[in-house]
Amino acid sequence: MSNAEIRIAIVGAAGRMGRQLIQAVVLAEGARLGAALVRSGSSLVGTDAGELAGCGALGITLTDDLEAVANDFDVLIDFTRPEGTLHYLAFCRQHHKAMVIGTTGFDDAGKAAIEAAAQDIAIVFAANFSVGVNVVLKLVEKAAKVMGEYADIEIIEAHHRHKVDAPSGTALAMGEAIADAMSWDLKQHAVYAREGFTGEREAQTIGFATVRAGDIVGEHTAMFADIGERVEISHKASSRMTFAKGAVRAAIWLDGRKKGLYDMRCVLNLHDL
C-alpha cells in the first residue's frame, strides 16, 4: 500500500451499512473509494456508488465482478455475512489485499480462517468499530479486575428487528474482555438463556440477555451487581455512521502494515491503557 490515498473497496455497497461506508470514505482524509461491490446479479450493477449513497457522482459504479476491480483497491471493508466474508477473505489473501472485517456471527472455523489469513495479510477484525464501544471494552475489563470475583455479571444488548445473530458480536466481545480479565474461558462461564425453574444464580458466570425490536441501532450494557450496589457500563449508538467512520479509520491505519491480525483497540491504542 503506502499510496498518498488508501483506495478502499466496500462490500455490500448497496445496503444500509454499505451506503454509510461510502459516505464515510468520501468524508475521510487520506482515503478514496476504489470499488463498490454488490451481490451477483444485482439490478443496481452499473449505478454510480456516490449517487446511490447520496453524496454525488464519484465515477465508481457498483459491480458484482470482484476480479475486474482487483487492481483498484488496497483495503476491502466487509460488514456482510460470514459465508460471503470468507469468500472475500480468500480473494484478499491470494491478491495480498488488506481487509477490515466488521461481520459478526462466525463459528470457530471461520475465526480460524481469519487467523490463518492474517499470517499473509493485514486484517482489522472487530465486533464493533465505534470508538465509544471500544472504550467500553476497556472499562469493563478494568471493572472485572476489581469486581469480577464477587459481583453478578450480566450483559444486556438490544438491536433492530433485522439483526440475524444473537448475542451480538459486541456483547460477546464484552464477555470476552471480562473473561480475559478474570482468566476465564468464556465458553465455560457464559449463560445464554434462562427459562423455567433455573434455581439460584451460579457464581462466576456471565449472563447474556438479548432484545430485538424496531430500529434500534445498538445498545449494550455490562452490569456488575453486588448486594447493595451495582455498576453499569453502557453504550448506545444512534447512527450507523459511527461504525462506518471507525471502519474507514481502521482501513487508513492499515496502511504500511504487511500482515497481522488486529482489532479496533489496536487502532485506537487502547491495549496499553
Swiss-Prot record:
Q: Where in the cell is it found?
A: Cytoplasm
Primary location class: cytoplasm
Q: What class of enzyme is it?
A: oxidoreductase
Kindly list the biological process annotations in GO that this record carries.
Answer: diaminopimelate biosynthetic process; lysine biosynthetic process via diaminopimelate
**Positions with a binding annotation for (S)-2,3,4,5-tetrahydrodipicolinate:** H160, G169, T170
- Name the residues that bind NADP(+): R39
| HAMAP family hit by this protein | DapB
Q: What is this protein called?
A: 4-hydroxy-tetrahydrodipicolinate reductase
What organism, scientifically named, is this protein from? Answer: Erwinia tasmaniensis (strain DSM 17950 / CFBP 7177 / CIP 109463 / NCPPB 4357 / Et1/99)
Which gene specifies this protein's sequence?
Answer: dapB
